[in-house]
């Protein structure tokens, strides 16, 4: 419980709490994202919600006109008003096919398939004895 200084990229404050939230989550980005994150507007994504506290607008910064935009429901994501910073509590954004397609315009391989391909390559090109020797040294 308590607080600590963040990076200062978003006008937010987080009150840390005793219990940590870790759960699979499916959600949808807001329809009005701006800047480099516009492509994610209205995109449905899934990932793991991981955080230990509640994040809200920083009162003093909000009074001064520096307000973060809610990017995901339930305070899971925020964007600064310039549109160049996006902070989210949803881990796995760059493993979500819909997010990758929205951001890069193409379907890209997800991390699991990359590791599967690497494992297949190693299995095909290396003898088990050689790999065991590497591991033991």
Language model regions located:
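Cysteine-nucleophile active-site neighborhood
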Residues: 1-46
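Short, functionally important structural connectors and interaction interfaces within domains
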Residues: 2, 70, 85-86
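Conserved beta-strand scaffold positions in the cores of enzyme catalytic domains, especially
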Residues: 9, 45-49, 85-89
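Generic hydrophobic alpha-helical scaffold/packing signal
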Residues: 11, 24-26, 47, 51, ...
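Short, glycine-/Ser/Thr-/acidic-enriched flexible segments
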Residues: 14-15, 32-34, 51-57, 85, ...
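Short conserved micro-motifs at the rims of enzyme active sites and ligand-binding pockets
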Residues: 19-21, 59-61, 97-102
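Catalytic beta-strand/loop cores that center a nucleophilic Ser/Cys/Thr
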Residues: 34-82
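Acyltransferase
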Residues: 75-137
């Amino acid at each position: 419980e308590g607080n600590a200084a963040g990076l200062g990229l978003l006008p937010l404050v987080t009150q840390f709490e005793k219990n940590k939230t870790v759960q699979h989550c499916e959600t949808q980005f807001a329809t009005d994202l701006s800047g480099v994150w516009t492509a994610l507007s209205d995109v449905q994504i899934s990932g793991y919600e991981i955080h230990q506290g509640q994040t809200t607008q920083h009162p003093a910064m909000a009074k001064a006109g520096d307000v973060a935009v809610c990017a995901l429901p339930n305070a899971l994501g925020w964007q600064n008003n310039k549109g160049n910073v996006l902070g989210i509590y949803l881990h796995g954004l760059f493993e979500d096919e819909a997010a990758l397609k929205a951001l890069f315009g193409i379907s890209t391989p997800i991390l699991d398939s990359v590791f599967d391909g690497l494992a297949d390559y190693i299995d095909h090109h290396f003898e088990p004895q050689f790999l065991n020797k590497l591991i033991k040294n």
